[in-house]
Structures are given as C-alpha cells and as structure tokens.
C-alpha cells in the first residue's frame, strides 16, 4: 500500500465513522419535503463484489448524493439476493472438493483456507460474502441506509414475494403448461441468466424442421430459420466426417447428428437405432416435401453438427454460402423465389460476385449472408410464380388445391408473412416440425454443464406474452426516463419477444411457491418489485410484526390502500398505529425515482421490473427512471475468473483508497459506455485529488480579508460557471462530464487564480467551499475534509447546492486581459525582446455596446466619432460569441481599473514591466502614436525593445 493510498483510506474511514455516528444516511419520511428514492441491483453473495458492481453502485450513489444537495430527502437502501442456484452451485462444487474453484476463491477473493472449507454450506458461503460485500460498499463510501437491509430468504421477504405471486396468479398472469426453457441437464432444472457462467442469458430460438425423405422412407430433417426458401432447394449438405445417428422421433426414422439427437431428446421422445458417419448418406437422393422434387445429398465439411440437426438444405439463389460452395463444385442450379428492390433474380450470386468472393472459405461470405438475409426479410416479396413449384408429386385435384392455397397465402406475400405461413403449414401437414435451440451457444450452467433447451410439460410460468400486459409495459417504457436514451428501443424490443418464462424451480434457495409445494420461486422472478419492500421492512421490524401476520390483507392495505386499518388490524393482529405508519412510509417514498443496474440486465431483470410494476401497482406508483450503465473492462480486457483479472471492490479500495477509485470509475467513461479501468489512471487521479487537498490547505493558511478585487470576482464567477455545468451534468446523469468539471476544470481555475494573486482572499475560500459541495457526490471523503478545513458547518453531504453569482463584468475583465496579452505577444517587436510594454486604454465602453448592433449609423448616433465608428463596429465583429454575450450583459465596464487590477498577472505573462495609461489622460506620453489609436477593448500597445 502506498502512502497516498493510506492517506485516502484513513480519510475515508474517518468520515465513514462520522456519517455512521450521525446517522446521516438514514432518512425518515418528512411531509412537505420532496423525496428521492433510488435503488441499485442487489448482489448475489456467491463471491465478492467487484469493480463492475462498484461502477453501478457509484452511479447510483452520485445521483443520491446530488439529490441531497437539492434539498430532497433521499433514500438509497441495499439488500442481498440469496435466491436461486448461484450460491447453491458454488457451495456444491466446494463441498465436492473442487480444488480449482477453492484456489480461485482463495486467490481472487482472499478467502482464508480455513474459511473455504466451511463454504460447502451454502448459507455459510452466502453470509460470508454478504458480510464482505457490505464492508466493501461501506469502505467505498456509498451513502446507503443500512437500517433497511434484508436478504431474499428472510421470512418477511418471503411473505412479501408470496403476496406478489398470488396477485399475478389471480390476474391470470401465472400459468402452468408446456413451454421451452433453458435447462441444465445435470441439475434437471430451468436456468436463466443468473444461473449461468458470466450471467449469460440463454437465447432460445426456434428452427423449422423440413422433412426430406429418401426412397427407403428415411427422413432427413433440415433445420432452417428461412423455411420460405424450401421451394428453392437444390441439394442437402451433410458433414461426411461427423457422427450421425438414425433415430426414431415424431413417428419417423430420421438422420440427424449425434449432438442434435441429444438436444432433441429434451424436447421430444428420441430413440437411437444406430450410429453412422455422415459419409454413409452422401449421394442419396431425397424428396422435397413441398415441391416433390428429388435432390442430392452432398458432402460439406462446413456443416456444424452442433447447429440445428446437422443436415442443411441448400438454396444457392438466396444463400451466399450455398452459392459459393456449389460454384466450387461446379454444380450451381439457381431457382429464384424472392423479389427484392435493388437486386436481380439471384441476390446471393449477385452479392458474391460484387464482393469478389472467390471461394467458400472467404470470410466475406458472412457479410454477404447478412446483407442478403436482411434485405430479403425487410423488403423481400415472394414471386407470384412460386406456387407453380408446389406439389408436382401430387395427383389432381390435390395438386391444384395445394397450389391455390399457396397462391393465396404464400405467393406475392412479404417474406415475413410467407415464413410464418409455411412454418405453420409444414407442422400441421406433418411434413416438418419445430426444434428449439440455444442460439447464443455455448451457454454453461454455473456447474459447468452446457445448457440445452427442454420443453417442459408441467411447469409454472409467468406469461409475459399476454398482450394487454405487454401494452401496459410499453406505455411505461415510453413515458419513463431511460438513461441512456437509446436503450429505450432495446426495452421495447425485449417486451415484443418476451413470452412465457419459467418462474419456479425444484431446488435452490428462495421463497416457496404459495399454492404448489415442492417449488421455489426463481431468482429473476422474486426480484422485480423488491424496491417497495425497502420502504416498509424497517417499520415491520420496529413494530415486531411476525411473518405470519404479513397476510394478503396486510400487503393489500400497505401497498394498494385496500381495506381499512381497523379491519386489517382485526384480521392480522397488527396494531392500527403500526399499519398506518407503514402505509404512510410507503406512500411517502413510492414511486421509485430511479432504478440503476447494468445494461446486461435489460433483456431480463429490468424488463421484468417494468412488467411486474405495471401489473401490481396503480399508474401513479410506476417507476420514473431506469439507468443502465455499461460494463467494466480491466486494462483493456473483459474481467473473468478464468483470466484471474477480476478486481474485487474491497481490494480496489485497499489499492487506491475510496475516493481515487470513485474518481477513476467516474472519469473513465460516460454511463452508457463500457469502461476500461486502468491502474495508471487510478494513480494519476489519486495525485490529482491530493493536489486538490494541498490547494485547499494553501487557501486556508494564506487567506486574507480584503475588498474583492477583479481577480477575486473572476474566480467566483468562473467557479460559478463550472458548478453550473457540473449541476447540469449531474441532472442528466453525465457522471464523467461532472467529474471532469469539478475534479479537473475547477482545479485549473483555482491554480490560475493562485498564480495571479500574492495572497488568496476570503472570497476564494467561500468559492472553495462551494467547490467542495460540488465534488461531494463523486469524492465525498475528500469533500468532507475540505468542507471542514474551509470552515463549513455540519456535513458537506447535507449542504445545499452552492449559489455563486457569475458577475459578467468579472468574466469580461479576465477575457479582455487575456486578449490583450495575446495581442502583445503577436507584436513582432515583442518577440525580439521587450524592455517595457506601455498600454493605452480607451475607456469608452459605451461605444462597444452600441456597436453590438453592427450598424455604423447607429454607432455614430450613439455619439461615437465618425472616424472611429467603423473601426469599433469591425472590432466587435471579430469578437467571439462568448465575448459579445458578456458585453451585452454588462452595463458599465472600466477597462483601466480592470487592467490595473490584473497588472501583476500581465507582467508575469509578458515577462516585462508594464505601464498603463488612460488614452484620455493628457499627461500620458504618446509613445509611437499608440495613444490616439486606442479603441475600447483594443488598447494601443507600445513595446520598447
């Protein structure tokens, strides 16, 4: 640990202790005082929280602290998510004596060997990392109200979740039935993102199976995402070297890869009859079930047996990979199916040739495929004549009847409509079927088993596919604030594709499903409205209310205002006063003002949060904002346990100190961007914070009482502008921008000020106090130290947002002086060495005010001598927008007084003595004729070599 780190750690511990002793962050409802309620995703205590968690919590903490400065009563609570399998899986692995995992936990998280052995008990493991994570949050300086802390296996919380689920069930939003889910074969249970390694959400997709059949009745099921192209198939592909099986499923004998048979076995009954290599089936002829055509089976080593069924249909007119492969074989046959504006009859051939693709091994085929598939899906229309390709193998009148159906529902239809029709028709005609798969494979359970898709027959689901529920969720997404704004489209897209989701498991920690024994509510289903629980858990405990008293009537009254306190008290035994107090607490804090989490939770937790709020609560209690931040990299690489580069938050605090760590996480990227945490930047930021501390000491020790000078006024005005920009950044959750303003730009202003004065003034100390408040959301421990050092009363954390006045005249004076210095430096004689500089000031500021209109006649009418009028107008035109705005905001400006006030600064900048005269002073010498050429804001300058 460096001396610098030790300094900031000790500073942090001192102020954290004082906050704790004064209960600074434990708010009570304050009628008449505006509130702000913010939460961030509670962590799973299956390991130590790391700097990725730290970033999410920092953004929430910055927002919470800023809102306190605006005079709001702020609630920022935290709990711990024990539910589900993450904790249980790790405990099982440790209990089994897995040395690799045990060493990983000892190395990454610093777990002592004697402790790791006890972690085979899942509750021991959870409580260990619960405590460690809480300590890390405290040391990090989060302004959390710990009086509302809970875990998701606390009995009070379980009663709350059971109430929520009963509400959903009574609304018809929980159903039991058949549905595909991500599945861990080892544990025989559904899994979601929080059950997988790297929290990867299993993306369940649906293949359409098309049953091609050979002359012996053997079926070759191809798996496709584009069933509308089946009418253009010219051949099938099979990998000659891969392992295949002949198996019975769906009433057929079928050829599929061994891997496909395994995956299908979780969805339909599969009986393997024999094994074979793919080459056994190469050369066979198979019949297209839609057109009746016979097509060959070709070999292709590019076929992946782990994708689909391992049997692929080839459509060279509309699939670049197929076209390139058949061109290599010299057997291209093209059948046009889809018209797309901007393309000819054979889009695949056209794009392959345009891109100059020479072989099937060319990586550019990926881009070609994306282009063709995207264009055909977005703008493609099935050709009118495709129906004539249907049913050539059928006898009349069956052939004509089938073609009539295809003419009506397929030919001339947009691709997306044709796709839906033929997929449904193939299944209903038993000429095809459905196969589910993990489209973002491989996805692994935390136990290490690869996830598959299982079709569950008797599972409990939350039906996120219910249309009216979806519409209510869309309403909330459209009206709430979402940071970043571009994430709104992702929420709407997630709402569109969400369907039934398994909500209960048969193993793991959590809340029992209230109406069906043996089921435990899973982790992404018991974490959707827990923000409401924060508002009441403290009172429930204070009043000593037992879990069995937390009935449906209790929650209905507290959260929905249903029933009377007297009635509920009689049914539950909870005192009327307690019921009213708890109800009032909820009413004060809800709705939630901001929900903060990582962007990876948009496709699951955050969208479920939206759905469940609109289902349970009235509109006035719907959440107001979501903030979804980007990921955290470390030294340019994704953090992962396998790379051993995960940086636990507690260790990071130990390495850098809390404020340097906070500053680095704030400065590295804006909220929506991924953040690359670098050691060198953290150490540079620590030096910057120390220089701020040193500067404050210098201000206090050297400050003197004096009438404010132009330089003092400039400091106050400039800091006022910095703080205004910082406030705007905080309000927009532009955390990096706010950090740049208060930690770097404000420091630069103070540095410049101290370089211009011999001694700082009391006004400078007051400006520094304002600065301390503005930096408090980001680096609260340093801010408290500065606040106390500078004479601030109470805590900086509770100080109102500072109000400094930016006097335009003070800003104008500094800009004017800097312009003058630049003008002097641009004089050739100055560059040859100056003995002294003589400046003549024209004090006719009214001329410049008149010239803002830009009209010479107006300027002359204002009393400006005609020979000077055009010069003044031309001068004003050369000034920038900022300077012109300052001139417009100032009624009177004495250039001579301002310049004399800045004399020391000017002399330091020029490195030469400076003499200053009024151009209207008859006693002033006119050196080089410069006295008479002086204009307002454009002094006459004489350089003596």
Swiss-Prot record:
Organism superkingdom: Archaea
Alphabetical list of HAMAP family matching this protein: Leu_tRNA_synth_A
Intervals of motif 'HIGH' region: 43-53
Major localization class: cytoplasm
Reactions catalysed, as given in the entry: tRNA(Leu) + L-leucine + ATP = L-leucyl-tRNA(Leu) + AMP + diphosphate
Cellular localisation: Cytoplasm
Protein source organism: Pyrobaculum neutrophilum (strain DSM 2338 / JCM 9278 / NBRC 100436 / V24Sta) (Thermoproteus neutrophilus)
CDD domains noted in UniProt: LeuRS_core
Protein family according to the UniProt entry: Belongs to the class-I aminoacyl-tRNA synthetase family.
InterPro entries recorded: aa-tRNA-synth_I_CS, aa-tRNA-synth_Ia, Leu-tRNA-lgase_arc, Leu-tRNA-synth_Ia_arc/euk, M/V/L/I-tRNA-synth_anticd-bd, Rossmann-like_a/b/a_fold, tRNAsynth_Ia_anticodon-bd, Val/Leu/Ile-tRNA-synth_edit
The encoding gene: leuS
Name the UniProt record assigns to this protein: Leucine--tRNA ligase
Motif 'KMSKS' region mapped to chain: 638-642
GO molecular function, one term: aminoacyl-tRNA deacylase activity
One GO BP: leucyl-tRNA aminoacylation
